[in-house]
């Protein structure tokens, strides 16, 4: 780093340390300075005299580390008994640690380029001068502590949490430079070193704090590489949230759980129309222990304020001294609450009761099968409000009592494993069952249980239904309830408990009623000729009254209890409530799942046979990687053998949690295209059975027709020869003629005589004779009909054998197939220059649609507050703007609590029941997003072999975006097909994408996807339609019955089917964040290449190759570079030549070769032709190669073909040779027959 001059640094002038070690007796020789030499010499002489005249024992040792250690060693063995009796002295205050080199360097640079941002005199963060901009984090509130900078108008960027403005001209010299170069290593900031690794900035935990937002991070040259916004505590280290630069583009790096490091503004609360900081409540009331009721009232007044939890913590922590944090602090809030008794539908033996362990809620959102159970007792807290993991407290009559936690039990069809407990909540892992029971044993050894109907079936993680976590396997994303008792974002509502009736407080004494309070506050009401009611804390006697005419209830406003629908709310306080945090939040984690045994695979002709060995039910799925995926899946429970057909496009098979297996067929066959006719027919029959049968049938018919024609001509000649003898009565045919014409020397019956005989004796044979000409006519017409198809096939094969297209310009355009992993070569011929070969290979192709979020949906939670029971009166509903809110008033209720009737009246009581819906706590992690998908943008990652270098570039395939490969420009796209696997509406759930026509926002249906909708997981706007209907409560019971449709989100999770990852055609791989389809093998991609002149080599500079010959010693077609060609040549000089196949059906692996003198080179090629005839160009010279290729031995391979796959196989030269021989032989026979006929006709005509 360059030295930055400064006048004063830590109140001293900076001087470099001398290079030589300091001697024992230091002789100071001043530097020669002409203007002050005399004065300095006098000062030095005076200083030396003072040192020499001072006594040696009085000289203090020099303050260095070595002398200090020696002095400590000498003083260690001295034992002074007097010193032991001295009282221990207080430790002197430690001096502030001196800043290190990194801190000093940053302070020098920060002195000019950063400014404090203040709010009401407090430093909230910092603003930094970088380049030509003033940058300040947007979340830092306040004004820059500089008159010029405070006047600037800032532009806000919510995406990067940054505000920027132009630096005033006179302050540009103070700004720091920035850089996008960030090699991994250590950087500097105000508090020391910052480590950059894996794309993240981290510091030791504790080195940064709120108030550091806006501080810059420097490299060793003093350039700003990032600006700090906040941090996320990750244990020993803290990951920084920063804004940085990547090639002049601003990017934001935000680790998970990052918090903003702006100094928090004080939050205000309200008490008696007076505001105060929520973290510092006023002294009246200031503490729950001193004034519990007033403190709870103050908390209820501020329950909706942002600083409520600060006020709650301050009110429950009365000691002004700073206390040591521990897990007990998480239980401190429970001293303001109490357990309670509530109605349970089944307390054992099928009867209901008011149970101390009533079940409130059972949550099963965790995908790992863990249940979160809420009960009415409290675990981990004793009756004295102290924390004890081994205890629980429950409500025994009007007062809490302690019991052992060891007596707690949870069971479904079998006992469950309890994994965590705190407060009202239990975590348990349970087997499947239809009911859930919780219970405990109280202090009197009495067992209490409560059973609820609950269908529990542990969900399946992954693709295998296993029962226990394996030791080795695969990590998959899942969710669970974190076993942490720390405060979370989840909360429950609490309120003051209602007055609890207790008939046992009243006794009848000779016409009077005595109320015994037992140290409690009792509210009583008697109707004995007049109204007699009030509150009492002492025993009271009601004269001339009976117990049936009185009502007594215990009132307690010193504690909160859970806002339960099984307990009425306090009639005096109405809707007043508080909130407390609850433990065990739902979080995304990873779960280890097993991997099924690899199947035994046997390859066959266009098929694979898999022998599967499942240890437990395992999912098998497969799809074709062509246009029609034909997806299929099944659960395999026992050993099974499966045979699957492998199409030409390939087959993808997924077995359990293993990675997918991919298979491609090869053109393997038992015959050969270069053998005898029956071997050739067998070869083509196994490859193309239909085509082979048609061609062989037509060829056989043609050959038989030719043979038949020859026979007919011979018969005609024979008839011409024997006719004269037949017409002559008694003529005898000469022996030679009878031998040649195969006739008897006597006269035979004529055709008409034979026909007359058949008509009279055998008519079926007569008609068969007549149908022969008609059948011949039909066969001939069919042959003429099939002749154009054969012509098209031959024309297609002829076109495929034409040489590769070349271009005579440096602007080259080519089209490559959209197939990942298959290299494609193109040849650029430019007049006057040596040919250039460009090799391109698609490494990935991404289709990313433009998405607009309509809403998110998740599981809903039905919120049912405690019912309001209006004794001796009528309650009224009020309108509330809550989702799916419902409110009803039921008359004629007579509710009972455990101590007796809740109300004094019999029939004039009313119950107000209300309920509404809100997003469940699991919506932060378990939700599905509904998107509208628009036009997809395509991008490609391309590997280019250019000028001997392999270079990988990424480009948008839109035909407009240009990328540079060395000195050449490549423009990719647009793609030939605008196809995308995404419909107009898609649903994204975690890492899966589904095409789904979901309902629009505000039109959800009960029990279906979208029954509850919200714009984002954090937004407060919620729409719900769950068919929530309140029902009349049962007589004598305090509860809020209701009817509601089941969660549409959970129903969709069960019935959603396979995602696009498994069902997308063309082998697409679907990914999220962002949503995209990767490597879809559909269509072609045009590429335009602009090659500069300097990239070409002139013909005069390139070697000249002559006397070329080609020999193919081995060739296996339809295999990955299974052909080998040896080319002999003579080169004019040593150099490098481009090698290229001029035939599209043949792909050569090498792009260029070294040539020198008389030598030979070996190239590898791949083709689908059985008889490959192609031309190879080396430099500017071409040579003809011919190969007789044999079929591959492997039926199935796990890689796609590296050559052009033809729809129809070519005809081998051997097959053509056999066709010529057979056709020539038959043709010769026809020619001989024709010659005989001509001679006979000529002779017969000459006689006439």
Swiss-Prot record:
Q: Which Gene3D superfamilies match?
A: 1.10.287.2230, 2.60.40.350, Alphavirus E2 glycoprotein, A domain (2.60.40.3200), Alphavirus E2 glycoprotein, domain B (2.60.40.4310), Alphavirus E2 glycoprotein, domain C (2.60.40.2400), Tick-borne Encephalitis virus Glycoprotein, domain 1 (2.60.98.10), Trypsin-like serine proteases (2.40.10.10)
Give one Pfam family.
Alpha_E3_glycop
- Which intervals of the chain are annotated as region Host transcription inhibition? 36-68
The record's SUPFAM superfamilies line, in alphabetical order, gives:
E set domains, Trypsin-like serine proteases, Viral glycoprotein, central and dimerisation domains
Cytoplasmic-side segments? 714-748, 785-795, 1246-1248
Output one GO MF annotation.
structural molecule activity
Question: Mind telling me what this protein is named?
Answer: Structural polyprotein
């Amino acid at each position: 780093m360059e030295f930055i001059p400064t006048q004063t640094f830590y109140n001293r002038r900076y001087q470099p340390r001398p290079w030589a070690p300091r001697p024992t007796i230091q002789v100071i020789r001043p530097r020669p300075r002409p203007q002050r030499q005399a004065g300095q010499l006098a000062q030095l002489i005076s200083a030396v005299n003072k040192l020499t005249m001072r006594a040696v024992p009085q000289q203090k040792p020099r303050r260095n580390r070595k002398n200090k250690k020696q002095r400590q060693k000498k003083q260690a063995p001295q034992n002074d008994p007097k010193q032991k009796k001295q009282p221990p002295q207080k430790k002197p205050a430690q001096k502030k640690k001196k800043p290190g080199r990194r801190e000093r360097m940053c302070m020098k640079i920060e002195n000019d380029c950063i400014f404090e941002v203040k709010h009401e005199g407090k430093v909230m963060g910092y603003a930094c001068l970088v380049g030509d901009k003033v940058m300040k984090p947007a979340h830092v509130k306040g004004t820059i502590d500089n008159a010029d900078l405070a006047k600037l108008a800032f532009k806000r960027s919510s995406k990067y949490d940054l505000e920027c403005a132009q630096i005033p001209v006179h302050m540009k010299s103070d700004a720091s430079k920035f850089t996008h170069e960030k090699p991994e290593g250590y950087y500097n900031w105000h508090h020391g070193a910052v480590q950059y690794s894996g794309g993240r900035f981290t510091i030791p935990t504790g080195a940064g704090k709120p108030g550091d937002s806006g501080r810059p991070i420097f490299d060793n040259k003093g350039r700003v590489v990032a600006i700090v916004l906040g941090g996320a505590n990750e244990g020993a280290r803290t990951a920084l949230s920063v804004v940085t630069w990547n090639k002049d583009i601003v990017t934001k790096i935000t680790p998970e759980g990052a918090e903003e490091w702006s100094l928090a503004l004080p939050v205000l609360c309200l008490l008696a129309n007076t505001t105060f900081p929520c973290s510092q409540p006023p002294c009246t009331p200031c503490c729950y222990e001193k004034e519990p009721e007033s403190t709870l009232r103050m908390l209820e007044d501020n329950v909706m304020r942002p600083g409520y939890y600060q006020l709650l913590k301050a009110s429950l922590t009365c000691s002004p001294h700073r206390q040591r944090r521990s897990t007990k602090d998480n239980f401190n809030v429970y001293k303001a609450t109490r357990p309670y008794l509530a109605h349970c539908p089944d307390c054992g033996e099928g009867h209901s009761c008011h149970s101390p362990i009533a079940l409130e809620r059972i949550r099963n959102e965790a995908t790992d099968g863990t249940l979160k159970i809420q009960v009415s007792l409290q675990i981990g807290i004793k009756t004295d409000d102290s924390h004890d993991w081994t205890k629980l407290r429950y409500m025994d009559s009007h007062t809490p009592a302690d019991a052992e936690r060891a007596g707690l039990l949870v069971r479904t069809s079998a006992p469950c494993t309890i994994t965590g407990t705190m407060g009202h909540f239990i975590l348990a892992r349970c087997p499947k069952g239809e009911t859930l029971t919780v219970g405990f044993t109280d202090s009197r050894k009495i067992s209490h249980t409560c059973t609820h109907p609950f269908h529990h079936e542990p969900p399946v993680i992954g693709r295998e239904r296993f029962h226990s976590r394996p030791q080795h396997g695969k990590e998959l994303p899942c969710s669970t309830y974190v076993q942490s008792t720390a405060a979370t974002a989840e909360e429950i509502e609490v309120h003051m408990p209602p007055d609890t009736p207790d008939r046992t407080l009243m006794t009848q004494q000779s016409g009077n009623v005595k109320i015994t309070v037992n140290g409690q506050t009792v509210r009583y009401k008697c109707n004995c000729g007049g109204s007699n009611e009030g509150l009492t804390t002492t025993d009271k006697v009601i004269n001339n009254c009976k117990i049936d005419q009185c009502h007594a209830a215990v009132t307690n406003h010193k504690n909160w209890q859970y806002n339960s629908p099984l307990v009425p709310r306090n009639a005096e306080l109405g809707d007043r409530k508080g909130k407390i945090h609850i433990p065990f939040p739902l979080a995304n984690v990873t779960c280890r799942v097993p991997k099924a045994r690899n199947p035994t695979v046997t390859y066959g002709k266009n098929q694979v046979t898999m022998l599967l060995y499942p240890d437990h039910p395992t999912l098998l799925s497969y799809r074709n990687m062509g246009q029609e995926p034909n997806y299929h899946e099944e659960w395999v429970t026992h050993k099974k053998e499966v045979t699957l057909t492998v199409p030409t496009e390939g087959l993808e098979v997924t077995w359990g949690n293993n990675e997918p297996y991919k298979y491609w067929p090869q053109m393997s066959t038992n015959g050969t295209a270069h053998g005898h006719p029956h071997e050739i027919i067998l070869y083509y029959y196994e490859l193309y059975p239909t085509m082979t049968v048609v061609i062989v049938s037509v060829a056989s018919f043609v050959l038989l027709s030719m043979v038949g024609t020859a026979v007919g001509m011979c018969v005609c000649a024979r008839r011409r020869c024997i006719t004269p003898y037949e017409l002559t009565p008694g003529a005898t045919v000469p022996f030679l003629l009878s031998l040649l014409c195969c006739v008897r020397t006597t006269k035979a019956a004529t055709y008409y005589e034979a026909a007359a005989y058949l008509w009279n004796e055998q008519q079926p044979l007569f008609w068969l004779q007549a149908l022969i000409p008609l059948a011949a006519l039909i066969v001939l017409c069919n042959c003429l009909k099939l002749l154009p198809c054969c012509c098209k096939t031959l024309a297609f094969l002829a076109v495929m054998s034409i040489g590769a297209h070349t271009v005579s310009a440096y602007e080259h355009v080519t089209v490559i197939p959209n197939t990942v992993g298959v290299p494609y070569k193109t040849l650029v011929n430019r007049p006057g220059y040596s040919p250039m070969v460009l090799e391109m290979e698609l490494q990935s192709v991404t289709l990313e649609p433009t998405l607009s979020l309509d809403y998110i949906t998740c599981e809903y939670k039905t919120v049912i507050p405690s019912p309001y029971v209006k004794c001796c009166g009528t309650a009224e509903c009020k309108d509330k703007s809550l989702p799916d809110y419902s409110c009803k008033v039921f008359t004629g209720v007579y509710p009972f609590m455990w101590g007796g009737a809740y109300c004094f009246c019999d029939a004039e009581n009313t119950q107000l029941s209300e309920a509404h819906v809100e997003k469940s706590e699991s919506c932060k992690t378990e939700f599905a997003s509904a998107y509208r998908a628009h036009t997809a943008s395509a991008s490609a990652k391309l590997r280019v072999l250019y000028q001997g270098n392999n270079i990988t570039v990424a480009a948008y395939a839109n035909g407009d975006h240009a990328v540079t490969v060395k000195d050449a420009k490549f423009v990719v796209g647009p793609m030939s097909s605008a196809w995308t696997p995404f419909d107009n509406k898609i649903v994204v759930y975690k890492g899966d994408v589904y095409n789904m026509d979901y309902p629009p926002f505000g039109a959800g249906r009960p029990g279906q996807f979208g029954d509850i909708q919200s714009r984002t997981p954090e937004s407060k706007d919620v729409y719900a339609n769950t068919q929530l209907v309140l029902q009349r409560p049962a007589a004598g019971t305090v509860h809020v019955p209701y009817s509601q449709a089941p969660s549409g989100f959970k129903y969709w999770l069960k019935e959603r089917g396979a995602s696009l990852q498994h069902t997308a055609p063309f082998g697409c791989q679907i990914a999220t964040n962002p949503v995209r389809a990767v490597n879809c093998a559909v269509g072609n991609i045009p590429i335009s290449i602009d090659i500069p002149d300097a990239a070409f080599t002139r013909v005069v500079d390139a070697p000249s190759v002559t006397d070329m010959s080609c020999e193919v010693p081995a060739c296996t077609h339809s295999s990955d570079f299974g052909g080998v060609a040896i080319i002999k040549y003579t080169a004019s000089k040593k150099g490098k030549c481009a090698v290229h196949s001029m035939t599209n059906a043949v792909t050569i692996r090498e792009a260029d070769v070294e040539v020198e003198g008389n030598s030979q080179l070996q190239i590898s090629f791949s083709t689908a032709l059985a008889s490959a005839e192609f031309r190879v160009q080396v430099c500017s010279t071409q040579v003809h190669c011919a190969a007789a290729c044999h079929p591959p031995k492997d039926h199935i391979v796990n890689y796609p073909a590296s050559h052009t796959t033809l729809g129809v196989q070519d005809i081998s030269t051997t097959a053509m040779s056999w066709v010529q021989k057979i056709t020539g032989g038959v043709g010769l026979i026809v020619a001989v027959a024709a010659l005989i006929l001509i001679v006979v006709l000529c002779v017969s005509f000459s006689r006439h």
